[in-house]
Amino acid sequence: ITLLAAAFTGPVKALDGNWLKDACNAPYGTQDNGVCDGYITGIHEMSTTRLCLPADVTNIQLMDVVTRYLNDHPERLNRKSRILVQDAIKQAYSCKK
């Protein structure tokens, strides 16, 4: 049990836009880039926001949308990363009225 507890000690990273931007801008194939992919996929799949994504949209395309949004909006990076993911995808794939 002590060993298990020790595995989870250490500094806690804030899950804000700065953290996500760093992860998403990491080189493709790195652990950080994989964390970005998994995080965006998880937030997207849990989202209840009405979106009109193309049926063939890929995780890589969603990562590109979110990464571009984060890079283009540095003034928002202090916000929670889950909100930024939702905002980026909603901006790119909102349904036409």
Where are the regions that the model predicts?
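Short, charged low-complexity intrinsically disordered segments located at boundaries
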Residues: C52-P54, T67-H73, Y93-K97
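Short N-proximal segments of mature Sec-exported proteins
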Residues: L15-R68, A88
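Residue-level marker of positions within ordered structural domains that often coincide
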Residues: I1, G29, H44, N71, ...
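Bacterial N-terminal signal peptides
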Residues: I1-A7
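Short, compact, well-ordered microdomains
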Residues: P74-K97
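Sec/Tat signal peptide C-region and signal peptidase I cleavage site
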Residues: F8-A14
